[in-house]
């Protein structure tokens, strides 16, 4: 994105943050590195440039990884999983697909390399989503927290005057919901016209 902006002479500023490869699994209760399972992590694009002559992914090495994240991973998932399996990864390896990670409408589907594509289809998982592969996915059962927030999955319209709504909006987000601000009220002071 930055290259595109630079090429088109558009000024920009980059604000660093936590990559979705770490934040999204954390919101789903999946510790991508866990001392009992893995000390390393592989982050891979789910789809390479289609005009490349050959893949730059070393599938043989990747299939030995204990924790893999595919960013933008749903479109080519079956093809990518077949490459991992044909290079020695067990078809029973746990896998999670997370759509809309960190948002009030986050959806997580669990499975293994063999059945995840059908589960993704059944649950209508589409982009934006990421894929996590490895035994770390098993921790979700005990560590999921975001979906347990009281307003998770709720979209709430806040009609208060904008200057009075910030604390309510903040509480909605803190509790897992999404606030839509539509101020229908405006508060003004009344001027006393009596003499």
Which residues make up each language-model segment?
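General beta-strand structural signal in soluble alpha/beta enzymes
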Residues: 12-17, 34-35, 70, 97, ...
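Short glycine-cluster motifs
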Residues: 1-48
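Short, charged, surface-exposed secondary-structure boundary motifs
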Residues: 22-25, 52-54, 105-108, 189-194
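Short beta->alpha linker loops
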Residues: 16-20, 72-76, 163
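A contiguous loop/helix-start segment that scaffolds small-molecule binding in enzyme catalytic cores
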Residues: 2-3, 38-40, 44-160, 169
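Surface-exposed, charge/polar-rich loops and edge strands
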Residues: 91-92, 149-195
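Structured helix-beta-strand junction loops
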Residues: 8, 64-66, 175
